[in-house]
Structure formats: structure tokens, C-alpha cells
């Protein structure tokens, strides 16, 4: 009997990449999504009899209980993602990110393992040392605060694990252009200019396909990983904003201006260690150069920035 994986938020940026990978690996995949950002990224999967789609909202506890009943594994992606989107509608962010997660914990069966997509944003601003899974959390934004609360409740509930992902980038069936590397590449290619504030602020990055691969890895290694939290990314992908902008400039000629005034509203600034999950055998495979090359090719068919933003 095949394993049934239930993916909340499966029509989103990460969900579309994950769904395709899981189907290729032979899993039954049920996507539960309210289609807040549309569902076109899922269209290729409807030809696969192992793919199932349920339109629903994790804030609807009764519907969620009915939908999740047959699942073996739950991958919880559904969220209002990122500082700007949470700032725009704080109540919605709390309802989805915290209350929606509580609904899922309330209705899942004891045998159903939850794999939770958490975030490195939980670390906030932390300079002077690499953040490990034991580093005290210091979220600076509503997004980070809501994800930190939800992560804690998921782990406290048991039969679960959490991934604190680096900042995502790369091509997905459901694109996002509000992510740093995706946005910088788009502006370089389409606008031929970029004004950069606070250029020394650091992030760690992970390609969306590597995010999908991490969930696949966890499903195959549940007994070694359950009831724990893991940073997911690569130390080789720790870059500040200037370094990313210059990498893109090597591939796309554009005007880059470093502004002395102005403030990035997202004040995250940290570097992360990924030794813990690497010891288990998981390493990322797609670097920034490859990811940017793919973005440049994909952007030849993308002209409307707002269509692929979470804002």
C-alpha cells in the first residue's frame, strides 16, 4: 500500500515543487489549499491518478478533519509567508499561521506524523556566531513570531518534526517574485537597476527544489528525525545582500546603487549552521549560480511582477 502524504498549502511556491517530487517518488499526494494565490502550478499533476486535490482552508476545522483522515504523513506548509504579507494583514497571519496550525494538531490522528515548515526567521538578528538549533530564538517580525509559536506547539504535540528553512529562491510552478534572490534577479533583468539598502545584512539561502527534497528525505528517515528540529540549508549559501547583487550582476548587466540612507524593514541578519542535518545525510544540491541561471531563463516568459508576489 502506498503512503498517502497530505500537503497543506500545496498549491504554493514550495508545495508545487514538493508535490511533483513526491508523485515522482510514488507517493499518493493530497493537496489541501484554499487557492489564495491560484492553482495553476498544480495543473500538470492532475494527469497523475496518485494526485488528489481538496479546496479548503486550515481555519475550517471541520473540513480539515474530514480531509486529513486518510493521511499517513502531513506536510504543513499552509501559512501567510514573509514579513510584508503578515504586516499587511496581521489578523489573517495569526489566524492562519497559529490558529490554523492548532486546528491541524487538534484533528490529526495519533499515528499521523507532521512535518512542519518553519523558518530561519525565528532567529531574527544574531551576529557573532553561527545559529544552531540550540540558539535562543529572537523573531523580529510577526511572521517570525507566528512561526516560532506554531513550531513550538507542533513539537510539543509530539510525533512531529520541524525544518527551519533558509530563505527560499528559485524557479517553481507557482513562482514568487517577492523573495530576495528572485526579486533582485527580476529587477536586474527587467528594470536594469537595483537600489540596495543595508547591503551587509546576511541571509542563508536554499533552492525550492532542495526544500522539497528535504521533506522527501524526512519521510524516508522519520524514525531518526521525529520530535526534533533541524536547520535546512548550507553554510556555503550564507551571503549578504551585496554579494547576491554582485553575483547577479556577473550574469546580467544592470545599474546597482548602494544607498547610504534608507532602511530595510526586514531587519533579519544572521548566519546558520546546518551540521545537524548534514550528519544525517542531507545536503543541498543547487547553488545560487545555478538557481539564478534558471531564473533568468524563466523570466523570459514572466512580465507581470504582481502576479507572482505574495503581496
Language-model-detected regions and their locations in the chain:
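Conserved Rossmann-fold NAD(P)-dependent oxidoreductase catalytic core, especially the SDR/UDP-sugar
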Residues: 76, 102-142
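N-terminal Rossmann/SDR dinucleotide-binding element
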Residues: 2-73
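Active-site helix of classical SDR
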Residues: 146
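NAD(P)H-binding glycine-rich loop region in Rossmannoid oxidoreductase-like domains
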Residues: 58-95
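C-terminal substrate-binding subdomain of Rossmann-fold SDR/epimerase-dehydratase oxidoreductases
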Residues: 191-192, 196-311
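NAD(P)-dependent short-chain dehydrogenase/reductase
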Residues: 140, 152-203, 208-219, 248
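SDR active-site strand-loop-helix element
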Residues: 8, 32, 74-78, 114-120, ...
Amino acid at each position: 500500500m502506498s503512503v498517502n502524504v497530505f500537503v497543506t498549502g500545496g498549491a504554493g511556491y514550495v508545495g508545487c515543487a514538493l508535490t511533483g517530487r513526491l508523485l515522482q517518488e510514488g507517493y499518493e499526494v493530497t493537496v489541501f489549499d484554499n487557492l489564495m494565490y491560484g492553482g495553476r502550478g498544480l495543473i500538470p499533476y492532475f494527469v497523475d491518478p496518485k494526485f488528489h486535490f481538496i479546496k479548503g482552508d486550515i481555519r475550517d476545522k471541520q473540513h480539515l478533519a474530514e480531509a486529513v483522515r486518510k493521511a499517513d504523513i502531513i506536510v504543513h506548509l499552509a501559512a501567510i509567508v514573509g514579513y510584508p504579507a503578515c504586516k499587511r494583514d496581521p489578523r489573517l497571519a495569526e489566524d492562519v499561521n497559529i490558529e490554523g496550525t492548532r486546528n491541524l494538531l487538534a484533528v490529526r490522528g495519533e499515528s499521523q506524523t507532521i512535518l512542519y515548515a518553519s523558518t530561519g526567521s525565528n532567529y531574527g538578528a544574531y551576529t557573532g556566531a553561527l545559529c544552531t538549533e540550540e540558539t535562543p530564538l529572537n523573531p523580529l517580525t510577526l511572521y517570525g513570531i507566528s512561526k516560532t509559536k506554531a513550531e513550538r506547539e507542533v513539537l510539543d504535540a509530539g510525533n512531529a518534526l520541524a525544518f527551519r528553512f533558509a530563505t527560499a529562491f528559485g524557479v517553481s510552478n507557482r513562482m514568487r517574485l517577492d523573495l530576495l534572490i528572485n526579486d533582485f534577479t527580476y529587477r536586474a533583468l527587467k528594470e536594469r537597476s537595483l537600489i540596495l539598502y543595508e547591503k551587509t545584512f546576511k541571509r542563508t539561502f536554499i533552492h525550492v527544489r532542495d526544500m522539497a527534497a528535504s521533506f522527501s528525505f524526512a519521510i524516508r528517515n522519520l524514525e531518526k528525525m521525529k520530535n526534533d528540529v533541524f536547520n535546512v540549508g548550507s553554510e556555503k549559501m550564507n551571503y549578504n545582500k551585496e554579494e547576491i547583487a554582485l553575483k547577479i550582476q556577473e550574469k546580467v548587466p544592470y545599474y546597482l546603487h548602494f544607498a547610504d540612507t534608507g532602511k530595510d524593514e526586514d531587519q533579519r541578519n544572521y548566519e546558520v549552521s546546518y551540521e545537524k542535518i548534514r550528519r544525517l545525510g542531507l545536503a543541498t544540491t543547487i547553488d545560487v549560480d545555478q538557481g539564478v541561471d534558471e531564473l533568468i531563463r524563466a523570466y523570459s516568459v514572466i512580465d507581470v511582477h504582481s502576479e507572482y508576489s505574495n503581496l
